[in-house]
From Swiss-Prot:
Composition-biased stretches (Basic and acidic residues): 214-228
Region (Disordered): 214-239
Designated gene of the protein: xerD
Gene Ontology biological-process annotations: cell division; chromosome segregation; DNA transposition
Listed SUPFAM superfamilies: DNA breaking-rejoining enzymes
Domain Core-binding (CB): residue ranges: 8-93
One GO CC term on file: cytoplasm
Residue stretches making up the Tyr recombinase domain: 114-318
Gene Ontology molecular function terms on file: DNA binding; tyrosine-based site-specific recombinase activity
Record-given protein name: Tyrosine recombinase XerD
Keywords, comma-separated and alphabetical: Cell cycle, Cell division, Chromosome partition, Cytoplasm, DNA integration, DNA recombination, DNA-binding
Amino acid sequence: MSGQPMAGRDGARLESFLEMMSAERGAAANTLSSYEHDLADLREFLGRRGQSLTEAQTPDLSAYLTHLAAQGFAATSQARRLSSMRQFYRFLYSEGLRGDDPTGIIDAPRKGLALPKTMSVADVNRLLGLAAQEAATEGPGQLARIRMHLLLELLYATGMRVSELVSLPVKVLRQEGRFLMIRGKGNKDRMVLLSRAAIEAMEKYEAGRKALSQEKSKAAASQKKTDTAESPWLFPSNSKEGHLPRQVFARDLKDIAIRAGLTASAVSPHVLRHAFASHLLQNGADLRAVQELLGHSDISTTQIYTHVLEERLQELVQTHHPLAKQGKNLD
């Protein structure tokens, strides 16, 4: 760690951020002033928690937004503060000044207790379609594009938590059939079903990994290196955990959402998990079955999705209930 005092380092990086926004982004003076004010307020809040602006983690930033809400800030004002935070931490990440973006999985504040965000089937298809198209594009970075396509197919096909998704072991590539065993909260195992599209994406990703591994082995052999051990993770990374950080995936998901013409704030790993559950229920799935697939230990947790059933249940009652039929006969 640098010998520079924490307060001094925070100030220097904040100054560098503002200089970048001015020189490279052409931000107006009022915009720069807003960034400076927002981040100075965040810095003061973090200081009271014994945390620095540079090293703040997701829970620290979420606590700040909660603090703003408790102070009576409108959702729009909270969203502006979050936007300033996103710009700053993306700058730190892009400059290599920290290894992650702690704002990647923070959703924009919203008023009141809202129903779970979800996506329409059309929007999900749009997202998956673009991911497949980009994965098929040859050239530099193709394996990363294939990986992104697989991540999205797995997430929508299974409804996995993002923490479960990014930490899948590489041994899942050796599993046969359409079922996948995953380990969720409390180290509880559960079985999920893979779609045909997810299986095909996994096969393409496996082929890409093998090709890269062979290239690395050849390079190591030419340099007489022997350390070519394979990562135990399906989505390896140079992160502390060794696998793809969920914040990085969340950020990349918002980027591809924008390219697909969707609103970035309306798309996140958790929203895709909600879409998985909502679309199953809309098409007649049993709530208990969805509970098992999501890995909820309590049915009450799954019941937040019952709002999607209202229209379908009304139609079922009108079509199949004996009294409803009797009423039709009397007409």
